[in-house]
Curated annotation (Swiss-Prot):
<comment type="similarity">
    <text>Belongs to the FliE family.</text>
</comment>
<dbReference type="GO" id="GO:0071973">
    <property type="term" value="P:bacterial-type flagellum-dependent cell motility"/>
</dbReference>
<dbReference type="InterPro" id="IPR001624">
    <property type="entry name" value="FliE"/>
</dbReference>
<dbReference type="GO" id="GO:0005198">
    <property type="term" value="F:structural molecule activity"/>
</dbReference>
<protein>
    <recommendedName>
        <fullName>Flagellar hook-basal body complex protein FliE</fullName>
    </recommendedName>
</protein>
<dbReference type="GO" id="GO:0009425">
    <property type="term" value="C:bacterial-type flagellum basal body"/>
</dbReference>
<dbReference type="Pfam" id="PF02049">
    <property type="entry name" value="FliE"/>
</dbReference>
<dbReference type="GO" id="GO:0003774">
    <property type="term" value="F:cytoskeletal motor activity"/>
</dbReference>
<keyword id="KW-0975">Bacterial flagellum</keyword>
Length: 107
């Protein structure tokens, strides 16, 4: 599978995921494939980190007794952050496996 084919499959997967989430996304190829992938990867890592930070802040506010912060909201945010982290780890593992498979291909 060529790099262009891989990027095309990844773009289609992103479109499907966005449509499933209810967002509309237009099909466009990134200007440079490497930069597009790196920016998506960095964006995802920052988003996961942001979810974890927000969950911790909400938990701290709940512990301090700030009005308007309910336990169920704290628990839901903590679970969302946990699921996002586990998803990120699984995606990382799949990318490493794909990289190793490509590197082991005979030329």
């Amino acid at each position: 599978m060529t790099t262009q084919a891989i990027h095309s499959v990844l773009a289609m997967m992103n479109i499907t995921a966005e449509q499933a989430a209810g967002n509309t996304l237009t099909l466009s190829a990134p200007a440079t494939a490497g930069a597009g992938f790196m920016s998506e990867l960095n964006s995802s890592i920052k988003q996961i980190n942001g979810m974890q930070i927000e969950a911790r802040r909400k938990a701290e506010k709940f512990e301090l007794g700030v009005p308007g912060i309910a336990l169920n909201d704290v628990m839901v945010d903590m679970q969302k952050a946990s699921l996002a982290l586990h998803l990120g780890i699984q995606v990382n593992n799949k990318l490493i496996n794909a990289y190793q498979e490509v590197m082991n291909m005979a030329v």
